[in-house]
């Protein structure tokens, strides 16, 4: 499409389309794709380090499989701000909420990566917990029935309070 005859990028793309390539009218697949977008934005914006969003990720923008549309001066590369759909408005609101959480909770903006080692409080800098508050063990990580996960970040090294992030996919 961009005149590069596939010389401008890799074909080693890691994508998951929920069983259908390209656009679909299947509402179940569309719902699953939107859930994946929210989950991945949450993973990115609540993770350590500098979050790297691509222009339009906050509204689920697609370039229809073109991983390098730099030379496209058309709808493929434009951001459709004047005509976003309700699901895109919802995704944008989710992104805003996640960035607000990141700004409000210093423990999510650490200057160091987690080690799992105890901090001056005696607690590990990060703990992974089951829904019942017990530590995740190998069996919990491997259990396909596990639908909840909690991350407890000890904020002491940064002079902030601890932060608990709870992720629950039950019923979704």
Regions found by a protein language model. Give the residues of each.
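Loop/helix patches that line or flank the sugar-binding groove of alpha-linked glycan CAZymes
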Residues: 1-172
């Amino acid at each position: 499409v961009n005149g590069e005859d596939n010389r401008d990028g890799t074909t080693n793309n890691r994508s998951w389309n929920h069983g259908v390539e390209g656009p679909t009218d299947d509402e179940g697949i569309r719902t699953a794709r939107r859930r994946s977008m929210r989950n991945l934005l949450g993973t990115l914006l609540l993770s350590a380090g500098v979050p790297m969003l691509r222009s339009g990720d906050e509204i689920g923008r697609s370039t229809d499989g073109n991983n390098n549309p730099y030379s496209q001066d058309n709808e493929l590369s434009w951001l459709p701000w004047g005509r976003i759909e309700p699901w895109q408005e919802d995704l944008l609101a989710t992104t805003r909420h996640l960035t607000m959480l990141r700004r409000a909770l210093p423990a999510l903006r650490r200057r160091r990566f987690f080690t799992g080692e105890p901090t001056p409080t005696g607690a590990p800098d990060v703990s992974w917990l089951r829904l019942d508050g017990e530590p995740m063990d190998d069996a919990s990580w491997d259990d396909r029935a596990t639908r909840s996960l909690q991350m407890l970040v000890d904020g002491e090294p940064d002079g902030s309070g601890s932060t608990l992030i709870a992720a629950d996919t039950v019923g979704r």
